[in-house]
Amino acid sequence: MIELWPAIDLIGSTSVRLTEGKYDSEEKMSRSAEESIAYYSQFECVNRIHIVDLIGAKAQHAREFDYIKSLRRLTTKDIEVGGGIRTKSQIMDYFAAGINYCIVGTKGIQDTEWLKEMAHTFPGRIYLSVDAYGEDIKVNGWEEDTELNLFSFVKQLSDIPIGGIIYTDIAKDGKMSGPNFELTGQLVKATTIPVIASGGIRHQQDIQRLASLNVHAAIIGKAAHQASFWEGLK
């Protein structure tokens, strides 16, 4: 069964969503982060909660650590955190604060030896966020281009014991126009590492289609704030 990971994106300790990762598209969510934690925690089908420090991602170092630490105390659900994590000490601080999994992006993409070291130090607890526009990987809060191809890069990761690859199609993110099923399916076939889909998810039918592609988990952003998404789920 595909896992459901609702997302909480933070700017200044406020729950927001961006469209295509553009910081000038910031939209405040109807629920606060605390309210979202309480809401998502009532569902058995929610396997973990996905929290992103958006300013941390842009500034290249964690900004919301103390606030996220306070959110951790509000639920027994597993929590994963990403955004600006660039050092082993930051990872250790999050784990010491009770965070279950850490997501690395830019640092892990630009320094795969460091990624390998972190993955071996914390096996199964490090996830790699790979954000792409089409097949072109972007870094530093999606604001910087790379020369890396999504599929070529992912194939290099096969011997690194990360928990999974969180794949975001930037063109779909925040639009609720449906995931990029074609690229997601190709990515699942290109690697033995679990693939987590993020970006554009609208409703349970999208989740079912992702499940049919053998996607390990789905991160739900804007749709998670709509009661209709949760209808019939326990």
Swiss-Prot record:
Location(s), subcellular: Cytoplasm
GO biological process: L-histidine biosynthetic process; L-tryptophan biosynthetic process
Record-linked Pfam families: His_biosynth (PF00977)
Cited CDD domains: HisA (cd04732)
Enzyme class (EC, first level): isomerase
Active site annotation, chain numbering: D9 (proton acceptor), D131 (proton donor)
Catalysed reaction equations from the record: 1-(5-phospho-beta-D-ribosyl)-5-[(5-phospho-beta-D-ribosylamino)methylideneamino]imidazole-4-carboxamide = 5-[(5-phospho-1-deoxy-D-ribulos-1-ylimino)methylamino]-1-(5-phospho-beta-D-ribosyl)imidazole-4-carboxamide
Keywords: Amino-acid biosynthesis, Cytoplasm, Histidine biosynthesis, Isomerase
Main localization category: cytoplasm
HAMAP family reported for this sequence: HisA
Family: Belongs to the HisA/HisF family.
Stated name of the protein: 1-(5-phosphoribosyl)-5-[(5-phosphoribosylamino)methylideneamino] imidazole-4-carboxamide isomerase
Organism: Staphylococcus aureus (strain MRSA252)
Taxon lineage: Bacteria, Bacillati, Bacillota, Bacilli, Bacillales
